[in-house]
């Protein structure tokens, strides 16, 4: 949600920011028109309430003196009716303003590159050299099917398209990755692990910016609960509608969950393999912090995600996303892209974002300053995947494949896999 005071003072800057996010309509003008009408109605209501209070006092005095007061009573009734009518109009304008603001993305941070799509993203750094194969590397789905450990046909028969069955050692590899990642986040980086439901109320989805704009992208149950598209939804809402103390911050959560997405806008993209699925596992990081520390927290969070890839010895690059490629709630985002030799390209495996106060305004979460307890500021929220389990499995399969179709197991994972060193038939 946006700060209406900022829009009042900086309409041109807000308009420019929205255009950089791909919003072409004249948003600031529309917002200020609605805001003006709402404030005008609020002023009228305040004036009418003042008049009614004065008349009420006058009626009391007249009754005490046993003087006639019928005229004043009728006037009070008339004002009450007018207040009720204007209150309905004021609420309608408030709802209209919230609806417009709720559908607009966050304002990009000043150092975010301006651009329409991924072609304007900036590479920040790279890690690791690409492996030189003495054979033509295969894709993960070719490897998985030949090993008999990845079944797309049965998944499609039972569940439909964009689902995958992992068996045997590949299923075990997924479990090993979950355990490795969570232990690292908790033991090395001080995150608090959370196990949570996969279903949430619409309010929780609204608070993080998933609703109303992306309603069609999530799965809705018959009793109005939604399957989470990411643990970010639940973890961020753990602090919804609270006033915290600055000394409590930062708070850092981590969780593994199954995630569910319709992928409504992905028709024809990544139809083979398990790059883009309706259901996938992911380990998520969420940080709750202050305005002054949120930029540093984003750097820390990104480095945590990178550390996993370093321990897995997978080559990757870090990209600073441009304004048009960031997620709806983000003001600054790093994507980490892992090298996939089977595709001969880098693909996203993690996305770490600073959402600033955008989500906090929606869920009404603030903190009191240590120097001034009366001063309340909105918290800043951050989220990042560390990492997507399916895509990490893909990266291991393609980077650690052998000429005979077997897959070496990264050293850091072997203790989670009964000390196995290779995945084979």
From Swiss-Prot:
Keywords: Aminoacyl-tRNA synthetase, ATP-binding, Cytoplasm, Ligase, Nucleotide-binding, Protein biosynthesis. One of its GO terms (cellular component) is cytoplasm. It catalyses: tRNA(Ser) + L-serine + ATP = L-seryl-tRNA(Ser) + AMP + diphosphate + H(+); tRNA(Sec) + L-serine + ATP = L-seryl-tRNA(Sec) + AMP + diphosphate + H(+). SUPFAM superfamilies: Class II aaRS and biotin synthetases (SSF55681), tRNA-binding arm (SSF46589). Its EC number is 6.1.1.11. It comes from the Bacteria. It is an enzyme of class 6 (ligase). HAMAP family: Ser_tRNA_synth_type1. Consists of two distinct domains, a catalytic core and a N-terminal extension that is involved in tRNA binding. Belongs to the class-II aminoacyl-tRNA synthetase family. Type-1 seryl-tRNA synthetase subfamily. This is Serine--tRNA ligase. The lineage of its organism: Bacteria, Pseudomonadati, Pseudomonadota, Alphaproteobacteria, Rickettsiales. The gene is serS.
């Amino acid at each position: 949600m946006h700060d209406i005071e900022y829009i009042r003072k900086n309409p041109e800057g807000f308009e420019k920011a929205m255009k950089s996010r791909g919003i072409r309509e004249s948003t600031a003008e529309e917002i200020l028109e609605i805001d003006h009408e709402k404030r005008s109605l609020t002023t009228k209501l305040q004036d009418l309430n003042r008049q009614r209070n004065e008349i009420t006092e006058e009626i009391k005095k007249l009754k005490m003196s046993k003087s006639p007061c019928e005229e004043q009573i009728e006037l009070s009734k008339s004002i009450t009716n007018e207040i009720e009518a204007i209150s309905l109009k004021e609420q309608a304008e408030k709802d209209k303003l919230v609806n417009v603001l709720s559908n607009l993305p966050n304002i990009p941070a000043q150092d975010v590159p301006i651009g329409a799509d991924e072609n304007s993203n900036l590479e920040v750094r790279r890690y690791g050299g690409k492996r030189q194969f003495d054979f033509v590397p295969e894709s993960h789905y070719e490897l998985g099917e030949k090993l008999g450990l990845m079944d797309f046909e049965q998944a499609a028969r039972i569940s439909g398209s964009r689902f995958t069955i992992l068996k045997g050692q590949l299923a075990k590899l997924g479990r090993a990755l979950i355990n490795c990642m969570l232990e690292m986040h908790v033991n090395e980086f001080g995150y608090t692990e959370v196990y949570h439901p996969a279903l949430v109320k619409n309010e929780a989805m609204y608070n993080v910016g998933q609703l109303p704009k992306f309603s069609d992208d999530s799965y809705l149950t018959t009793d109005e609960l939604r399957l989470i598209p990411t643990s970010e939804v639940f973890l961020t809402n753990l602090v919804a509608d609270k006033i915290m103390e600055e000394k409590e911050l930062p708070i850092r959560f981590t969780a593994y969950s199954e995630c569910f997405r319709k992928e409504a806008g992905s028709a024809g993209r990544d139809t083979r393999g398990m790059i883009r699925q309706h259901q996938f596992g992911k380990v998520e990081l969420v940080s709750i912090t202050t305005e002054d520390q949120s930029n540093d927290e984003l750097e820390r969070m990104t480095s945590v995600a990178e550390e996993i890839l370093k321990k897995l010895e997978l080559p990757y690059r870090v990209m600073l996303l441009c304004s048009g490629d960031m997620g709806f709630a983000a003001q600054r985002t790093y994507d980490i892209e892992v090298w996939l030799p089977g595709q001969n390209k880098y693909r996203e495996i993690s996305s770490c974002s600073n959402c600033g106060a955008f989500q906090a305004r929606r869920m009404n979460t603030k903190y009191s300053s240590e120097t001034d307890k009366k001063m309340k500021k909105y918290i800043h929220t951050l989220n990042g995947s560390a990492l997507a389990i399916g895509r990490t499995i893909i990266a291991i399969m393609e980077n650690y494949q052998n000429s005979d179709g077997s897959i070496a197991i990264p050293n850091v994972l072997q203790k989670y896999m009964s000390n196995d060193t290779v995945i084979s038939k």
